[in-house]
Amino acid sequence: MTKPIRNVAVLGATGSIGAAALDVLARHPRQFHVSLLAAGQRVDALLALCHTYRPDHAVIGDATLYTTLRDGLNAAGLATKAYAGEAALAELVASTTCDTVVAAIVGAAGLHSTLAAARAGKRLLLANKESLVLAGMLLMREASISGAEIIPIDSEHNAIFQCLRSRTTNGVHRVTLTASGGPFRGHNRTMLAKITPTQAMAHPTWSMGPKISVDSATLMNKGLEVIEAHHLFGLPSEQIDVLVHPQSLVHSLVEFIDGSTLAQLSLPDMRTTLAVGLAWPERIGSGVPGLDLMKHNRLDFEHPDTETFSCLRLARDAMQTGGTAPAVLNAANEIAVSAFLQGRIGFLTIPALIEHALTTLPRYEADTLETLLTVDTETRRITHAALTHFPLPL
């Protein structure tokens, strides 16, 4: 019996994860139809993707670019319907337009559409880690009510998901997330003070966008992933470990109470995890070759240096504090990373700004979306204001 084609929405289509998702989808035209493409501001790139994939709908986040998108689609003779803005995207994601959503919008901007997909009971391939960090309790609650199927796309959480064959953690003693260590593994603080945005974006093993590359360099990416694992798998902090693994071949390990440990290994390529999410529980080709252990015959592990790279420690502290503290962490980090990429602050000012926000703002219960968004806005305001009080980059 032929299975029905799955209609897939790719949110953040012009980014690195969006490109990887579309690559996998294009390999399986009889199984998947790209029904919706969404991007933030890169309207020309979105138009090019629409020409290639012929989606039913296209959404540009920046409403001022709506006319450009609409006219570009008409000029190309495409039947794709144009939309703009966060509300339009959330409405489309919740509609019958799609049954599968690749949530790859970077930052808190992806929260509304991710929540909309969860509320509508979609299969949600979650690559937007900020949604879990900012509103993890709300997101998981909505998914539980609607029956939405959340499959994490981060390589570490996807590895845990594969080892467990679900998000059920019966019999789990602990999980270990691996980190490449970023491009500055082994650097001291004196060396880090001179790091430039270009250097920070040169990740040794993964191909990623600017923001996540900087997060990897500061180890904030791993801190956010610890919080993600807490929400996705219902594990407390003491059952979530982190090890630096520079080869990026072992993506996570799951240790069970009987002494067994399962690990997932693959080449560092997001197409693998996206293929898992799209076809689960079946397997489909991703375009990624298998792992040749004779070629990659060395696996190294070490503890992370949380004194030099304090973002990982700050993330754990925020998770332990709970409530709105992770939302503060996330918003302050987004502002700090943006300022660093613009050359307005130095690399070491990123954790300093985050710590400033965490110590300045009070903790509230994270029980409503309105509370979280208010805290997010206030955190961005005080972090913006604090930029002038920190030294300029060397």
UniProtKB/Swiss-Prot annotation:
Pathway(s) annotated for this protein in UniProt: Isoprenoid biosynthesis; isopentenyl diphosphate biosynthesis via DXP pathway; isopentenyl diphosphate from 1-deoxy-D-xylulose 5-phosphate: step 1/6
Cofactor(s), by name: Mg(2+); Mn(2+)
Cytoplasm as UniProt keyword: no
Keywords: Isoprene biosynthesis, Manganese, Metal-binding, NADP, Oxidoreductase
Record InterPro entries: DXP_reductoisomerase, DXP_reductoisomerase_C, DXP_reductoisomerase_N, DXPR_C, DXPR_C_sf, NAD(P)-bd_dom_sf
One Pfam family here: DXPR_C
Catalysed reactions, as listed in the record: 2-C-methyl-D-erythritol 4-phosphate + NADP(+) = 1-deoxy-D-xylulose 5-phosphate + NADPH + H(+)
Binding-site list for Mn(2+): D154, E156, E225
Superkingdom of origin: Bacteria
Residue numbers binding 1-deoxy-D-xylulose 5-phosphate: K129, S155, E156, S180, H203, S216, N221, K222, E225
The keyword NADP belongs to this UniProt entry's keyword annotation: yes
EC number: 1.1.1.267
GO molecular function: 1-deoxy-D-xylulose-5-phosphate reductoisomerase activity; manganese ion binding; NADPH binding
Enzyme class at the top of the EC tree: oxidoreductase
Gene Ontology biological process terms from the UniProt entry: isopentenyl diphosphate biosynthetic process, methylerythritol 4-phosphate pathway involved in terpenoid biosynthetic process
Residues that bind NADPH: T14, G15, S16, I17, G40, N128, E130, G209
Role noted for this protein: Catalyzes the NADPH-dependent rearrangement and reduction of 1-deoxy-D-xylulose-5-phosphate (DXP) to 2-C-methyl-D-erythritol 4-phosphate (MEP).
Family: Belongs to the DXR family.
Protein name: 1-deoxy-D-xylulose 5-phosphate reductoisomerase
